[in-house]
């Protein structure tokens, strides 16, 4: 990770704020901090996430500023809307600094036991590989499907629905899935977009948990369809149309794989 990026963020928010980089993607760098964006710190146990979009030197400066502002504001607005959906679990938005390209959110998840990594769905399923069909795995994967169903039923799409972008929060013996990273998210009622979301997640499961992926996706889709079916005839009709398009997306993906 670039020391220049870390230095720039420290200059923006002050040397007194401790920012720990935890990951870097093509568009943004993710930090954790114990400093709230605007409230005085009284404890030190709370942790927050700062998603920072650094300037892109390959873009014209004025275009880069405009794009960064647009994408940062767009993601923050989307998170704000998603928080209003009953039952949908996403990070709580705390602050948005569009001029510096950063979003502050609540921190979700924990480190899994025995150094198994962070509690996203990918690492959780790896941790449970010795008992892949246990009740807790089945319940968790079904709940993931319910969360995606809620997202899609309300006409929102994730845009990058991988097992790394589903964080699990422990609640006793259970794990509650939360959807994170809506940088590519959108408000869309197109079955094509929803079908692509499902296909991306199916491929992610197949690539990282190939031995059990078929069963996992079956459970996931049972949770997903239950959301639509709970809305009666209208839900059944929308589900039928979505699943038909999902099969078309699947077929296109297989053809691309065959052609290399």
Swiss-Prot record:
It catalyses: L-seryl-[protein] + ATP = O-phospho-L-seryl-[protein] + ADP + H(+); L-threonyl-[protein] + ATP = O-phospho-L-threonyl-[protein] + ADP + H(+). Residues 16-260 form the Protein kinase domain. GO terms for molecular function: ATP binding; ATP hydrolysis activity; protein serine kinase activity; protein serine/threonine kinase activity. InterPro entries: Bud32, Kinase-like_dom_sf, Prot_kinase_dom, Tyr_kinase_AS. SUPFAM superfamilies: Protein kinase-like (PK-like). The active site is at 160 (proton acceptor). One of its GO terms (cellular component) is cytosol. Its EC number is 3.6.-.-, 2.7.11.1. It comes from the Eukaryota. Its main location: cytoplasm. It is found in: Cytoplasm; Nucleus; Chromosome, Telomere. Component of the EKC/KEOPS complex that is required for the formation of a threonylcarbamoyl group on adenosine at position 37 (t(6)A37) in tRNAs that read codons beginning with adenine. The complex is probably involved in the transfer of the threonylcarbamoyl moiety of threonylcarbamoyl-AMP (TC-AMP) to the N6 group of A37. BUD32 has ATPase activity in the context of the EKC/KEOPS complex and likely plays a supporting role to the catalytic subunit KAE1. The EKC/KEOPS complex also promotes both telomere uncapping and telomere elongation. Belongs to the protein kinase superfamily. BUD32 family. This protein is considered an atypical serine/threonine kinase, because it lacks the conventional structural elements necessary for the substrate recognition as well as a lysine residue that in all other serine/threonine kinases participates in the catalytic event. BUD32 has protein kinase activity in vitro, but in the context of the EKC/KEOPS complex, the catalytic subunit KAE1 switches the activity of BUD32 from kinase into ATPase. NCBIfam families: arch_bud32 (TIGR03724). Component of the EKC/KEOPS complex composed of at least BUD32, CGI121, GON7, KAE1 and PCC1; the whole complex dimerizes. This is EKC/KEOPS complex subunit BUD32. It comes from Eremothecium gossypii (strain ATCC 10895 / CBS 109.51 / FGSC 9923 / NRRL Y-1056) (Yeast).
């Amino acid at each position: 990770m670039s020391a220049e990026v870390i230095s720039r963020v420290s200059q923006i928010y002050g040397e007194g704020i401790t920012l720990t980089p935890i990951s870097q993607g093509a568009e943004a760098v993710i930090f954790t901090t114990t400093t709230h964006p605007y409230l005085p710190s009284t404890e030190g146990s709370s942790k927050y996430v700062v998603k920072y979009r650094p300037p892109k030197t390959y873009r014209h400066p004025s275009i880069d500023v405009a794009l960064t502002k647009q994408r940062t504001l767009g993601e923050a607005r989307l998170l704000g809307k998603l928080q209003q959906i009953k039952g949908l679990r996403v990070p709580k938005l705390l602050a948005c600094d569009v001029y510096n390209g950063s979003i502050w959110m609540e921190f979700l998840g924990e480190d899994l036991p025995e150094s198994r990594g962070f509690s996203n769905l990918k690492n959780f399923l790896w941790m449970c590989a010795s008992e892949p069909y246990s009740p807790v795995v089945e319940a968790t994967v079904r709940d993931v499907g319910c969360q995606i169903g809620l997202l899609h039923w309300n006409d929102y799409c994730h845009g990058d629905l991988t097992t790394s972008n589903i964080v699990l929060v422990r609640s006793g013996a259970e794990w509650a899935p939360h959807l994170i990273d809506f940088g590519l998210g959108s408000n869309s009622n197109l079955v094509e977009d929803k079908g692509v979301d499902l296909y991306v997640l199916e491929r992610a499961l197949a690539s990282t948990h190939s031995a059990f992926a078929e069963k996992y996706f079956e459970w996931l889709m049972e949770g997903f369809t239950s959301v639509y079916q709970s809305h009666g005839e209208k839900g059944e009709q929308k589900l039928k149309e979505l699943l038909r398009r999902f099969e078309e997306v699947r077929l296109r993906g297989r053809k691309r794989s065959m052609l290399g």
